[in-house]
């Protein structure tokens, strides 16, 4: 694969850049034509790589790309999942180059989607291409590439149910996560789920003069802050009744395996420019961000936030809250429990609403599975060191849906790094990670 990469490197850049130049931002209506254009370009790349068939399939939202190459029904089938939609680029003024005009500098590609997830799904197309052209492919390979991952995949689960037979496979292979570091590879054997809600606290029927009414009328922002502060106690435990009922404690053996991941607390604090860490008592930082649930306020607003001063007592206050969940916690159940709890602590002098948004369940895969062992062997060969099994703190809710619908496990071979700043300005992807990913994926097919 190394020789194939070196020989075709310039073509690879040209093809990947053709994807990165398409502003496939799924959350913005004005980019709907770009979503279709990106899907059609992926079909071209799959067919050129050696797929027997590939097509764009409509959904209730943005389209899905499906392609496949069937060698022999008796052989194992790998279903490659990826997403071609990207995050918005705001704030655009912080980018050092045009987010949709990819540049190579300092050994990395800079563009929106360079890592998440166009760069990583492109690795799969090229590894597949290599295996087909070199005659080494001994698997049936299917691709399912969606355009709604960044907005919670609202259409894919229903589409997958309707096309379950077409998607039948033995494993879901995914590259949409990070490694521990450039020198320490890891295989993600689980991810957290998500419950996302918006809360609204309403007081008086209009904004009031704080001099005339302050001290006599409840301020919705003050009330909201009090309610939010009560959601987590001094030990970092979430106070929502029933929140932890389905959380399964990890065994000492599993905690020991996860602790193999190198972690320097002082480096961590320096990187974030913070003096101390804070979280749930009794757990390490890696455990808090991987195997334990958490609750965070993602945004809070109300009243006057413009330039200068305006002394109002606001009528309404809002907040958006995410809860990261661990496997065995049900997203819909947690959303219901949160709603019941938040309404129960609301004082009677304000009106409180909870508006559920998207969510999804977490998942785990056994590290004893043949697919995990094949990935472990492949990454060891590429990096010269055995990968560490890790648990992702983020969420890809659709993977739990696909796991349930198709009755197969996902395997996450991610090659991104924290330095890639996905979802932020100046997203990038190291060339050596791009090429190492191609090598490792090709080796996965050899060993699986």
List where the protein language model places each region:
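N-terminal helical capping/dimerization or prosegment-like subdomains
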Residues: 1-92, 316, 333
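An extended, acidic, His-containing surface patch that forms the Zn2+-binding/catalytic region
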Residues: 48, 181-182, 239-316, 327-340, ...
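Active-site metal-coordination/substrate-binding segment of hydrolases
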Residues: 75-142, 436
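Acidic, glycine-rich active-site loops and adjacent beta-strand->loop/helix elements
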Residues: 84-86, 144-153, 175-179, 203-205, ...
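A generic structural motif
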Residues: 115, 205-207, 323-330, 360
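Acidic/histidine-rich catalytic neighborhood of metal-dependent amide-processing enzymes
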Residues: 117-190
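Flexible glycine/proline-rich, aromatic-decorated loop/lid segments
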Residues: 186-202, 411-413
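Polar, glycine-rich mid-to-C-terminal structural blocks
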Residues: 204-207, 211, 216-268
């Amino acid at each position: 694969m190394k020789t194939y990469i070196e020989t075709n490197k310039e073509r690879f850049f040209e093809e990947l850049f053709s994807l990165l130049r398409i502003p496939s931002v799924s959350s913005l209506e004005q980019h709907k034509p770009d979503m279709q254009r990106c899907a059609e370009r992926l079909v071209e790349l799959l067919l050129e790589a050696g797929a027997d068939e590939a097509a764009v399939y409509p959904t209730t939202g943005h389209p899905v790309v499906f392609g496949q190459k069937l060698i022999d029904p008796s052989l194992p089938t790998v279903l490659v999942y990826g997403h071609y939609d990207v995050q918005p680029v705001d704030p655009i003024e912080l980018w050092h180059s045009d987010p949709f005009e990819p540049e190579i500098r300092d050994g990395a590609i800079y563009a929106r989607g360079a890592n998440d997830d166009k760069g990583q799904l492109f690795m799969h197309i090229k590894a597949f291409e290599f295996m087909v052209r070199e005659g080494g492919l001994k698997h049936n390979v299917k691709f399912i590439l969606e355009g709604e991952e960044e907005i919670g995949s609202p259409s894919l689960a229903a589409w997958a149910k309707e096309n379950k037979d077409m998607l039948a496979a033995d494993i879901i292979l995914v590259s949409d996560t990070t490694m521990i570091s450039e020198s320490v590879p890891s295989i993600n054997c689980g991810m957290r789920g998500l419950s996302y809600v918006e809360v609204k606290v309403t007081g008086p029927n209009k904004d009031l003069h704080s001099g005339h009414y302050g001290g006599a009328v409840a301020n919705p922002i003050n009330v909201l802050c009090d309610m939010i502060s009560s959601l987590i106690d001094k030990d970092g435990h979430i106070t929502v009744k029933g929140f932890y009922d389905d959380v399964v404690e990890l065994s000492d053996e599993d905690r020991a395996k996860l602790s193999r991941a190198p972690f320097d607390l002082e480096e961590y604090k320096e990187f974030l420019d913070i003096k101390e860490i804070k979280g749930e008592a009794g757990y390490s930082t890696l455990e808090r961000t991987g195997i334990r649930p958490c609750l965070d306020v993602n945004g809070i607003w109300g009243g006057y936030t413009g330039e200068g001063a305006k002394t109002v007592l606001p009528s309404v206050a809002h907040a958006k809250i995410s809860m990261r969940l661990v496997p065995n916690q049900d997203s819909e159940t947690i959303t219901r429990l949160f709603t019941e709890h938040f309404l129960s602590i609301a004082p009677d002098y304000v009106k409180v609403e909870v508006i559920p948004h998207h969510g999804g369940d977490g998942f785990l895969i056994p590290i004893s599975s043949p697919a995990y062992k094949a990935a472990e062997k492949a990454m060891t060969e590429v990096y010269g060191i055995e990968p560490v099994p890790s648990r992702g703190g983020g969420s890809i809710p659709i993977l739990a849906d696909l796991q349930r619908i198709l009755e197969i496990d996902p395997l996450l071979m991610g090659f991104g790094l924290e330095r890639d700043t996905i979802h932020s300005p100046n997203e990038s992807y190291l060339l050596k990670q791009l090429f190492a990913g191609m090598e490792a994926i090709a080796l996965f097919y050899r060993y699986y």
